[in-house]
Swiss-Prot record:
Component of the Mediator complex. It is found in: Nucleus. The keyword Electron transport does not apply. Residues 226-236 have a biased composition (Polar residues). Component of the Mediator complex, a coactivator involved in the regulated transcription of nearly all RNA polymerase II-dependent genes. Mediator functions as a bridge to convey information from gene-specific regulatory proteins to the basal RNA polymerase II transcription machinery. Mediator is recruited to promoters by direct interactions with regulatory proteins and serves as a scaffold for the assembly of a functional preinitiation complex with RNA polymerase II and the general transcription factors. The keyword Acetylation does not apply. Keywords: Activator, Nucleus, Transcription, Transcription regulation. Pfam families: Med2 (PF11214). The gene is MED2. GO terms for cellular component: nucleus. This is Mediator of RNA polymerase II transcription subunit 2. Residues 212-247 are annotated as: Disordered.
Amino acid sequence: MVPKTGVSDRQENKLTQYFDDILRLSADLLTQQQLKTIKLDPKVTTGFSKAQQKGLGDRITQFYSLLDTLDVSLQTTADYVGAVKDSALQLKKQREEEQIKKQEQEKLERQLLEQQKLEQQQLEQKQLKQKQQQQQQQQQQQQQQQPQEQQHEQQQRYSAKNTPIDMLTNFDTDLPSAGITQAQSFNSEFGDLNGMDLSMFDSMDNQVGFGGLQNTSGGNEKKNDPQINFNDTNAPPSAVNVPENGNPSSYLTLNDFNDLGIDWNAANDNNELNLEDFNI
C-alpha cells in the first residue's frame, strides 16, 4: 500500500478518499483469499482480522452515506431545475396567454371601432336621406304654394284694379279725396252759385214735382257711392244699368246747363247772370 501524506489527503475530497480506501481493502481481501486458496504460505489465516473488517465496514458505510448525500443533492438539484423549468414554462405560457388576450382585445377593439364607424356611416346616410327628403318636401311645398301665391297675387292685383283709390290709399297726412277735389274744381269753374236766381226754372219744378226731386236725391246718393261709380266706370256700356227715377225726358240736368255754354263768372253788379241771349 502506498502511504498517504497529509497534504494529499487534504487535497482529495472525501468521496475519492473513501473510494480509494474501499479499493485498497478489497484488493487486500482478494490477495489473502488467493493466498489461502493456493496455500503458498501455511501461516496465513483465512479472512480479515477484526480491525480490518471494522475499517472496511466504516469506509463502505461512509461511502454509501456520501452517495446518499450526493443522491439527495442531485435530487434536490433536479427538483430545483424542474421547478425552474416549470416556472419558466408557466411564465412562458402566461406570456402567451397575455399575448393572446392582448390580440383578442385588439381584435375586439377593432371590431368595435369598425362597428361604430359603420353605425356612424349609417347614421350619416340616414341623416342625408332625411335631409334630401326634407328638401324634396320643401320643393314640393314650394311648387304647390307657387301657383297659389301667383293666384293670390293675381287676385290682389285684380282687387286693386277694381277697388277705388280712396279705399286703397292710407296716408299719414290729410289729403283731399277725389270727391272734394272734384267739388272744389267745380266751384272754381262755375263760380259762386249761391246768389243765382233759380226762379226762372219754376217750370221745371212744376213739370217734375216733388217726387222727382226725391228720386234725384236718391240718384245722387247712389252716385256718391265710390264703389258703384267705379264699377259703373269700368263696366261695359251694356252692363251699366241706368236707374229709373221717374224723371221725364224734359228734366234738365247739370250737363244740360253745361251744354248751353253759360258763362257763370260773367255776372252783373247784383251778382245775377245775364241770360238775355239764351232762350230757355
